[in-house]
């Protein structure tokens, strides 16, 4: 493992460092936050699941909502519990210990590119199970850097631990069995390119 890869791994293991460097590289997530504000219904008391919530970087957007954040990383969840409002649980997105039809909407940011197609299907099936009929999923996932000139974006993908960064068509194919795509787009967040899809079950 190279020096840069070790640095990325070290940063990823520490919630405060992770938030700081990701915010720096992604312009404080302004583009991501704008899409969340547009596509999810915020502050209306809705039951919302932030799946793969990490250290809770977007919890502040859901003030007034019944927010549950779930992540497999206990350090991230401990940090979120100390610093954010909401309920935060350690959990495997492929097999959620949550009741059927518990949520009105789900945010998935930067989770599925860590998972194989089989595991991604398991996550989407769980999302469909815990959502009410007609519930929304906003999935924002890493895609290969759009511009060849985005050297830092290419470098980050080469060392980042997401082993399943997919082209857009692969995400669309995976989503099609579980939900209808209401709106989708490519967006740039700092040096990172994402595919954002608003899905309706």
Model-derived features: where do they sit?
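Class I SAM-dependent methyltransferase Rossmann-like catalytic core
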Residues: 2-31
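Conserved alpha-helix/loop element of class I SAM-dependent methyltransferases that forms part
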Residues: 25-44
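Class I SAM-dependent methyltransferase SAM/SAH-binding core
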Residues: 49, 54-95
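A conserved beta-strand element that flanks and buttresses the S-adenosyl-L-methionine
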Residues: 107
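Short catalytic micro-motifs in class I SAM-dependent methyltransferases
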Residues: 110-114
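A short glycine-rich, Lys/Arg-flanked "PGG" loop and its adjoining helix->strand segment in the class I
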Residues: 121-133
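C-terminal alpha-helical "lid/dimerization" subdomain adjacent to the S-adenosyl-L-methionine
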Residues: 139-193
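C-terminal lobe and adjacent flexible extensions of AdoMet/dcAdoMet transferase-like proteins
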Residues: 199-201
């Amino acid at each position: 493992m190279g020096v840069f890869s070790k640095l990325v791994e070290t940063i990823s293991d520490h919630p405060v460092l992770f938030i700081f460097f990701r915010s720096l590289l992604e312009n404080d997530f302004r583009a991501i936050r704008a899409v969340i504000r547009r596509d999810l219904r915020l502050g209306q008391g809705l039951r919302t699941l932030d799946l793969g919530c990490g250290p809770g970087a977007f919890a502040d957007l859901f003030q007034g909502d019944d927010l549950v954040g779930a992540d497999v990383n206990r350090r991230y969840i401990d940090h979120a519990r100390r610093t954010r409002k909401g309920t935060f649980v350690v959990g495997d997105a492929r097999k959620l210990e949550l009741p059927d039809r518990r949520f009105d909407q789900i945010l998935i940011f930067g989770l599925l590119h860590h998972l194989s197609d089989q595991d991604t299907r398991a996550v989407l099936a769980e999302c469909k199970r815990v959502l009410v009929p007609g519930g929304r999923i906003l999935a924002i996932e890493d895609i290969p850097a759009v511009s060849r000139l985005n050297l830092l974006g290419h470098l980050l993908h080469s060392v980042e631990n997401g082993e399943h960064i997919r082209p857009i068509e692969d995400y669309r194919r995976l989503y099609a069995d579980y939900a209808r795509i209401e709106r989708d787009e490519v967006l740039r967040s700092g040096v990172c390119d994402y595919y954002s899809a608003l899905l309706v079950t």
